[in-house]
Amino acid sequence: MEEIPSLVIDPGSCWTRFGYAGEESPMTILPSYYGVRSDVTGRNKYVVDELQIHAPIPGMEVKNGKSNGIIQDWESTLYTWERGLKEKLQVNPTEYAMMITEPSWNPQSVRQQIMEAAFEQLHVPAFYLTKQAVCVAFANSKSTALIVDIGSDNASVTPVVDGLIIRKGIFKQSLAGDFLNANIEQLFNTMNIEFPPHYRIARKSVAIQQSGNMANGSADAVKPAVLYPPIQDLTSSYEIFQKRRVIEEWKESVLDVLDTPFDEAKASSRNPKPFEFPDGVTHKFGQERFRISEILFNPSFSASRSAETTPPQGSVGLHELVYQSILACDSELRSPLLNNIVVTGGTSLIPGLSERLQAEVQRLATGSRINVHTAETASATSNAVWFGGSILASLDNFQHLWVSKQEYDEVGVDRALFVEKRCK
């Protein structure tokens, strides 16, 4: 096939990234969450831009087109892809080969649908579907690695050997970002912390100095926040989405992981961290910021007061999930995999997590050399899947792997088997 420029789409659970193969970072990032409301004709009208989706629009439902990393809603997904390509990148997909990333457990039926969407809706001349774990390995300059991806809806461990997935070593569970969010919400309820969403804030609360106390770091009084009037007909999904936004902000700025299994005295001895809620009210958090993150290593630390905070049966600590994956691999592969553990995903950015994981895996794999690798920056971690795809799609020895439109047309009805064979 004649070499043509290529694009990479990484449709993650929280964000969808678009850009040119060969570049170090995506050009455009759109939320995988989307807003949808009916227009006067009854047709769906989608909102996919980050700023617009946070606007309080009456009647707008906020949804996610993916579940467990798998595309479920094709209409909204294609709308997002077309907006990212045609309006944000301002490219014509018919002029570019298209690489799209996928989770290692993507079912055959969805793989077929992705290929059909690329050729029949986007009308690309060439296409390839590549595993996200393989992309992360290449983004970290490795062809063999154990990829530990801690995202929003699940934590997964995937062995990659010589650029190929070892399927029997794939392990995943739902103890990840969303599960922590549910526990954070429960923590706020327990602490009687209530906060208005960002869109209600007209003016934050203000500390008032009346007798010189501000110089000592305190105030005599607080002028409360001013809120905009309630907006009628906002949907419950929008309100939940806005609460999630604040919880995510809290998680990113407050959580820490202890370097040893949770110890109350040790956690209490660490300085508390303050967090300013949207209305300007600040609360300090001590041992609870370690207790929440401990759930990733010890599921019994979950609140377990509702279905959302009860660990699914069979849930294990992250280090145990890693070790299960290692033991499922052939013995000669275990040493190179343990020496090349790569941690990625948004939830992996909690300070101290990688160091704790290394210590816990070392305890399980006594005598083995353990090396846990992380990207140098938060953005490099967040963009690792996309960047790995960018590297792969631009390699000279990859060009013969593209599936051409002519090949696709010649396959006929056996497309599911075809995509399994060509995109491994």
From Swiss-Prot:
GO molecular function, one term: chromatin binding
Pfam families: Actin (PF00022)
UniProt subcellular location: Cytoplasm; Nucleus
Keyword set includes Transcription: yes
Gene3D superfamilies: 3.30.420.40, Actin, Chain A, domain 4
GO biological process terms on file: chromatin remodeling; regulation of transcription by RNA polymerase II; transcription initiation-coupled chromatin remodeling
Alphabetized UniProt keyword annotations: Chromatin regulator, Cytoplasm, Nucleus, Transcription, Transcription regulation
Residues of the signal peptide: none
Entry's Gene Ontology cellular component terms: chromatin; cytosol; Ino80 complex; nucleus; RSC-type complex; SWI/SNF complex
InterPro entries: Actin, Actin_CS, ATPase_NBD
Family matches, as SUPFAM superfamilies: Actin-like ATPase domain
PANTHER family according to UniProt: ACTIN
Family under the similarity heading: Belongs to the actin family.
Quaternary structure and interacting proteins, as annotated: Component of the RSC complex composed of at least arp9, arp42, rsc1, rsc4, rsc7, rsc9, rsc58, sfh1, snf21, ssr1, ssr2, ssr3 and ssr4. The complex interacts with histone and histone variant components of centromeric chromatin. Component of the SWI/SNF global transcription activator complex composed of at least arp9, arp42, snf5, snf22, snf30, sbf59, sol1, ssr1, ssr2, ssr3, ssr4 and tfg3.
Stated name of the protein: SWI/SNF and RSC complexes subunit arp42
Species assigned in the record: Schizosaccharomyces pombe (strain 972 / ATCC 24843)
Gene for this chain: arp42
